[in-house]
From Swiss-Prot:
Listed Pfam families: CASP_dom
Side Extracellular, residues: 39-41, 104-121
NCBIfam families the record matches: A_tha_TIGR01569
Protein name as catalogued: CASP-like protein 2
Disulfide bonds: none
Length: 150
C-alpha cells in the first residue's frame, strides 16, 4: 500500500535518507579513527564498537527509507542507541585528550590505569547511579505504558 499525499508518512522518507547518509559518514569516520589511534586500546575499542553498531544499524535505516512510518519504534530505538554511541565515542575522545595533556604537561609515565586508580571509589558510585537510573526509568516507562493501555 503506497502512502497517500496527505498521510504524512512520505515526508519522513527524506529524513530516513539523510539518516542513512549520516550513518555511512559515521562509519567512515569511526573506521578512520580506529586506524589513526592504533596503540591506544581504549580509543580503538570504543571506535570499533561504534563502527560495528553503525554497520548493524544500516539495515534498519534502509528499512525506514523503504517503508517510512511502518514502524515508528525503529526510529526511537535507533535514536536511543545513537545517543549511547555518541556518549561512548565522546568518552574515548576525552580519555585520549586527558592522556595527551597529562603526558605533555605533567608526568610522562602516567597512563590511564594510574589515573583511574585514583578515581576507584568514584567509579563504583557512577556505576551505582547508572543502575539506579536505568531501574527508575524502566519503572516509570512501565507505569506510563500501563496508563496508556488501560
Amino acid at each position: 500500500m503506497k502512502p497517500e499525499a496527505g498521510d504524512g508518512r512520505s515526508g519522513w522518507r527524506w529524513v530516513a535518507t539523510f539518516d542513512l547518509i549520516l550513518r555511512l559518514a559515521a562509519i567512515v569516520a569511526t573506521s578512520t579513527a580506529v586506524l589513526a589511534a592504533m596503540g591506544k586500546t581504549f580509543v580503538v575499542v570504543v571506535n570499533g564498537v561504534a563502527c560495528f553498531y553503525l554497520l548493524m544499524s544500516l539495515p534498519v535505516s534502509i528499512f525506514n527509507i523503504m517503508r517510512p512510518g511502518a514502524c515508528p519504534a525503529n526510529r526511537a530505538v535507533l535514536t536511543a542507541l545513537d545517543m549511547v554511541t555518541v556518549a561512548l565515542v565522546t568518552a574515548g575522545a576525552l580519555v585520549a585528550g586527558i592522556l595527551y595533556l597529562v603526558h605533555k604537561a605533567g608526568d610522562t609515565h602516567a597512563d590511564w590505569f594510574s589515573i583511574w586508580s585514583q578515581l576507584d571509589s568514584l567509579s563504583y558510585l557512577a556505576v551505582l547511579a547508572l543502575i539506579l537510573h536505568v531501574l527508575l526509568s524502566g519503572s516509570i516507562l512501565y507505569k506510563q505504558a500501563l496508563n496508556i493501555m488501560f
